[in-house]
Amino acid sequence: HIDGRLVSAEYDNNICVGLDILSPTGVMGNIYAGRVENVVKNINCAFVEIEKGVKCYFPLEADNNRHIFFNNKNNDKLNQGDSVLVQVIKEAVKTKPPTVTTKVSLTGKYVVLSSDIRGVNISSKTKKDEMSKKVQSLLLESLNTEKFGFIVRTNCKDVNESDFEDILKEAHDMSQKFENILQRATYEKAPVCLYKEKPLYVNHILGFPNDYIDEIITDDDNIYDTICAYLPENER
């Protein structure tokens, strides 16, 4: 730790190839039922309250009109007073507020659930990989993707068919988690936090291929316990 912030370092052959300093109190990745405070057309943005007194910036140029509203609507545009599903994609910086998007996602080791797509896509880095295509077919056959879709992560190019059960379980668990988030929003009044994202260091670890990591070292018992909770038992 440095001044209360977490330091994450990645080493390859004893050479530091990555260094991140993470805030332990950040809201990055958290999902909210946000309340639209106002829409400012002349600067092409909206401001969305995610917690009492916490307003976020929403750039309208990123708007794809595929919003999930929790109030009665007769159009798909953001309007003042709307209750809408948002996710924080950028932390506050000095005087700038956090940035949110309505393209909500949940990230796992093998797949990403996205509210912005339907069906199952493959990561652009592995579109031609045969194992990734097999995982795509598996998910298409097994999952309902009418409300949201999935992206097969790069990690899947290194899996075996013996991993398919774990991949399916992760995708099913994500589907249930997202449904629970939507369900909770029906009885919680905006603005309210519906889901807190995994710590950034956990997402960083889960993003590596199965055979990439030899060892994880930490001097913090809480971080150790958190990492163990997210890693499969055979990888601890």
Would you name each region that the model predicts?
Residues 1-26, 30-36, 43-44, 77-236:
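OB-fold/S1-family RNA-binding modules
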Residues 38-40, 51:
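Nucleic acid-processing catalytic cores of prokaryotic defense/repair systems
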Residues 69-74:
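Short alpha-helix capping/helix-loop boundary micro-motifs
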